[in-house]
Amino acid sequence: MKKGAVGIGTLIVFIAMVLVAAVAAAVLINTSGYLQQKSQATGRQTTQEVASGIKVTRVVGKADSATNPTYIQELAVYITPNAGSSGIDLTKVRITLSDGQKQAIFKYRVGNSANELYFLAELMQNLGATIKFDNGSVQVYFDPTDWTSAAPTVIIDTTNKVIEIVNATVDSNDNHIKPATDSNVTISFDTPVSLYAFANPVSDVFDNDAFNNLTTKTDFGIAVLQDSDGSLDNKEYPTLTKGDLVVLALRVGGTQSLGYSSGVSKISVISTTTTDVLTKQSSVNVTITWTAVFGNGFDTGTKVTGKVIPEFGAPGIIEFTTPSTYTQQVIELQ
């Protein structure tokens, strides 16, 4: 009996050991499978990070005058993807630029931010530009110098397509939108338009919508020079792929004035009553005027550094020193 009990006990221990080994083996198999998948994913990500990226092939500047050039005010940054790079979403690209005194970060305006409900509200809230609304007989102005104490609170109503400027009025003397305590100003739209700083195809690198449609001082535009597979056809989602060549358009100095036919239908002052100051006739034209981040632009002998930074992968490098004299308007800088 004792020997039988010992045998049964040994068998139980043996079975338990087999079960433990089986469980351990299952855990090891699952763990190894998980680690293998993780390592593969990490490898793909690492390969993507190493192989992908942007190469800056050249930088060309345009000065303020053909006869007496003094400041570089526009930059055309030529980029192409690195060899072996996967597609690069240009809406996620950021450009950093510094002249040693200031540093600016530029982005491509796309989607809702390209809609005038959003960029007009942004410009007013940030005091970023002078804005003129003109229906052909009446002009209404938003001027940042009228808001010296504080920037206005601006509310966007996308459902009713209205921008509301809180605690504001339209001065009857000069038709400027100014601070007030007992009224709001509403800017109503039929169909808000969208503006894209995008050009495809391009005949003149510096005279196209990539430069002309820049709506704020921290925008960059996209001018397509070469696109064999159509990956850059969609201005909402331009993607840089193998063989593509693109110019990123930046205004770095001087004043930009952008005029366009707007979707604005009326501008009203709302207090105890509603007064329509401007109503749409055939159309309402809007003119946006702003000064670039670097003031007049880059003077002679200025060292400029920066990067073109994709969402993943290696950034393209911008580094040049402007010439000691400007002898022509368009100048190769890098």
From Swiss-Prot:
Keywords: Archaeal flagellum. It is found in: Archaeal flagellum. GO terms for cellular component: archaeal-type flagellum. Disulfide bonds: none annotated. Its main location: other. GO terms for molecular function: structural molecule activity. GO terms for biological process: archaeal or bacterial-type flagellum-dependent cell motility. InterPro entries: Flagellin/pilin_N_arc, Flagellin_arc. Flagellin is the subunit protein which polymerizes to form the filaments of archaeal flagella. Belongs to the archaeal flagellin family. This is Probable flagellin PH0549. It comes from Pyrococcus horikoshii (strain ATCC 700860 / DSM 12428 / JCM 9974 / NBRC 100139 / OT-3).
